[in-house]
């Protein structure tokens, strides 16, 4: 029987009432593919990368990441890093609708805008955090500029181009569903949509009544026309930095993330499969994701052990080693809930980890 190790799960605590939000500075910069808007929080820290985020289709940086970065325990992280939130063109608040016939950038071109952002800010390296389309964009950027990326947190990434069967299903769905409903099906699981929780109602309202819905459709079309990233384990096309892959259990992109995990270097990759988190774990489980992010950063040498003391709270989990059922995947470890207490030592990624929490 595999030896059990235990790790405590942080209790979920939103930003405390009355806690002053960070000051933000919003900038726009011209690139070869049009203007891009980004918002900077904090000040650069010596010898530390910036945390750069990129949001999914139907969202902007606030609706995608605010619940995560305003979470109380996340403050330990953001005090130590400057943060750059990139909005895809036309997705920023108050963005004008693009004129009819506007050629929206491809996802590859959106990735090629990032060097302009970093040059404008005079930042040399980043830790990228992306969701869905944003995860793809950051992965593409990391392939093109590996020396500038120290780590990646990729939530719901699908590294594959749409295949003809996917296209047929997409076209058929488009005949019977509106753009907002198709995007909601991309963001959330069918179980979540059927449950119609307050979260689903909120995001359905945000997308359905978005004044820039035409722009959102352009971003959606670019995502559906993405190229294959062609990851190959042991090949030349791979991510060179530490990577944490994240997906919710039974989320729309679960299979794609599992496949992506099988193609990346197991010595550099951690795989976090989050139970009870639905399609958007950064919205539904910010506490668990914050904790995982802290361990990821600690493994990279950026979060000292003294910064991790607040992790020892309330709920606990057990870490057990298990062999993968997929021959293409490496030996994995699974994190499951337990009633006993303990700690998990952190270090650089040593092999692929499959984590359910």
UniProtKB/Swiss-Prot annotation:
List the Pfam families hit by this protein, alphabetically. Ndr
Comp. bias (Low complexity): 333-347
Residues with PTM Phosphoserine: 312, 314, 318, 321, 324, 330, 336, 338-339, 341, 356
GO annotations of cellular component type = cytoplasm; growth cone; perinuclear region of cytoplasm
List of residues that carry N-acetylalanine = 2
- Compartments, record wording: Cytoplasm; Cytoplasm, Perinuclear region; Cell projection, Growth cone
Region annotation Disordered: residue ranges?
1-28, 320-357
**Entry superkingdom:** Eukaryota
Biological processes, Gene Ontology terms: cell differentiation; nervous system development; signal transduction; Wnt signaling pathway
- Modified sites of kind Phosphothreonine: 20, 316, 320, 334, 343
Q: Which UniProt keywords apply?
A: Acetylation, Cell projection, Cytoplasm, Developmental protein, Differentiation, Neurogenesis, Phosphoprotein, Tumor suppressor, Wnt signaling pathway
Function, in words: Contributes to the regulation of the Wnt signaling pathway. Down-regulates CTNNB1-mediated transcriptional activation of target genes, such as CCND1, and may thereby act as tumor suppressor. May be involved in dendritic cell and neuron differentiation.
Give the family this protein belongs to, as stated in its UniProt record: Belongs to the NDRG family.
How would you summarize the oligomeric state and partners of this protein?
Interacts with CTNNB1.
Q: This chain belongs to which protein, by name?
A: Protein NDRG2
* Source organism of this protein record: Pan troglodytes (Chimpanzee)
Lineage, please?
A: Eukaryota, Metazoa, Chordata, Craniata, Vertebrata
Q: Which gene encodes it?
A: NDRG2
């Amino acid at each position: 029987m595999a030896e059990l190790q235990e790790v405590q799960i942080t209790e979920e605590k939103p930003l405390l009432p009355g806690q002053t939000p960070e000051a933000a500075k919003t900038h726009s910069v011209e690139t070869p593919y049009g203007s891009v808007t980004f918002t900077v929080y904090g000040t650069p820290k010596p010898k530390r990368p910036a945390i750069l985020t990129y949001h999914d289709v139907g969202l902007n940086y606030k609706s995608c990441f605010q619940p995560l970065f305003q979470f109380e325990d996340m403050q330990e992280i953001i005090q130590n890093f400057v943060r750059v939130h990139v909005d895809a063109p036309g997705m920023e608040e108050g963005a004008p609708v693009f004129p009819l016939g506007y050629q929206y950038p491809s996802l590859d071109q959106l990735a090629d805008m990032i060097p302009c952002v970093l040059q404008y800010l005079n930042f040399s390296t980043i830790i990228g955090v992306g969701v869905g389309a944003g995860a793809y964009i950051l992965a593409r950027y990391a392939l093109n500029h590996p020396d500038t990326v120290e780590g990646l947190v990729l939530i719901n990434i699908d590294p594959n181009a749409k295949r003809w069967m996917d296209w047929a299903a997409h076209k058929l769905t488009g005949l019977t569903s509106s753009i907002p409903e198709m995007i909601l099906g991309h963001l959330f699981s069918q179980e979540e949509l059927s449950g119609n929780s307050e979260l689903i109602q909120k995001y359905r309202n945000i997308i359905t009544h978005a004044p820039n819905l035409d722009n959102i459709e352009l971003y959606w079309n670019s995502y559906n026309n993405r190229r294959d990233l062609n990851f190959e384990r042991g090949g030349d096309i791979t991510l060179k930095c530490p990577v944490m892959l994240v997906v919710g259990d039974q989320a729309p992109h679960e299979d794609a993330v599992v496949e992506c995990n099988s193609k990346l270097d197991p010595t550099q990759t951690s795989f976090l499969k989050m139970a009870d988190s639905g399609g958007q774990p950064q919205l539904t489980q910010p506490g668990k994701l914050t904790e995982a992010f802290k361990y990821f950063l600690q493994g990279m040498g950026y979060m000292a052990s003294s910064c991790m003391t607040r992790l020892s709270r309330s709920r606990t989990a057990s870490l057990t080693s298990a062999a993968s059922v997929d021959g293409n995947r490496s030996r994995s470890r699974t994190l499951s809930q337990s009633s006993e207490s303990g700690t998990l030592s952190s270090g650089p990624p040593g092999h692929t980890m499959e984590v359910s929490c």
